[in-house]
């Protein structure tokens, strides 16, 4: 894979991952309710789910790419539209409140329940499914080993996801007051939304 293309992929992956979603809200809540170990458990469960989704998506993509090169162009357009859609969705997002049941940290929790919840959120989240199906093909070089590129992009995505979730979990412990401010979350939504739209427009020129 071309190095500059890989950097572009990392950039899109980063902004896709750090945008607020179910997995991030779970990491924040686990950090607020429990501790960083709970955040780690749910985060590991999440990236395992992401790997399974990427494998399923890649099997279908690889088969299609061998048949039709024009399909790649179609996916490129879909991928760009998807990024723009995410941007608009982020900007108009109204779900900016994190509700806490109690105002203290729980020292005891069910680790299996934490893991299961993180895994379930990952495999039922449409965002990574659409990402792996629509964004992956944009960066694949048919002249090189598809499997090698797949593992490189997948594990890069998983690594960024793990770091992102752990960071949100850590920040929820150290900056609890900030995360509970609706204005702060609204600003974050708008900034990430505009970045998605810009990336979607730029994707059409790759």
Positions of PLM-derived features:
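Juxtamembrane transmembrane-helix termini in multi-pass membrane transport proteins
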Residues: 3-73, 134-153
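Short alpha-helical transmembrane interface motifs in multi-pass membrane proteins
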Residues: 7-12, 81-84, 117-120, 156-157
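Residue-level hotspots within the lipid-embedded alpha helices of multi-pass solute transporters
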Residues: 13-17, 122, 126, 158-166
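Membrane helix-loop-helix hairpins that form the core translocation module of multi-pass transporters
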Residues: 37-113, 171
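Selective transmembrane alpha-helices of multi-pass membrane proteins
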Residues: 66-98, 161-171, 176-206
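Selected transmembrane alpha-helices and immediately adjacent juxtamembrane segments
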Residues: 111, 116-118, 123-128
């Amino acid at each position: 894979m071309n190095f500059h293309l890989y950097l572009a992929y990392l950039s899109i992956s980063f902004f896709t991952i750090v945008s607020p979603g179910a997995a991030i809200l779970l990491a924040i809540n686990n950090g607020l309710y429990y501790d960083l170990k709970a955040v780690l458990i749910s985060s590991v469960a999440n990236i395992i789910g992401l790997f399974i989704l990427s494998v399923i998506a890649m099997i279908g993509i690889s088969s299609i790419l061998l048949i039709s090169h024009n399909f790649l162009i179609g996916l490129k357009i879909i991928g760009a539209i998807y990024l723009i859609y995410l941007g608009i969705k982020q900007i108009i997002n109204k779900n900016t409140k994190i509700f806490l049941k109690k105002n203290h940290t729980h020292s005891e929790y069910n680790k299996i329940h934490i893991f299961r919840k993180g895994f379930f959120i990952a495999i039922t989240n449409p965002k990574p499914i659409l990402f792996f199906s629509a964004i992956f093909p944009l960066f694949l070089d048919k002249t090189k080993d598809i499997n090698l590129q797949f593992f490189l992009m997948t594990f890069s995505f998983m690594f960024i996801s793990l770091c992102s979730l752990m960071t949100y979990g850590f920040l929820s412990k150290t900056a609890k007051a900030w995360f509970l401010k609706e204005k702060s979350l609204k600003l974050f939504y708008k900034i990430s939304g505009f970045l998605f739209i810009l990336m979607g427009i730029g994707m059409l020129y790759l």
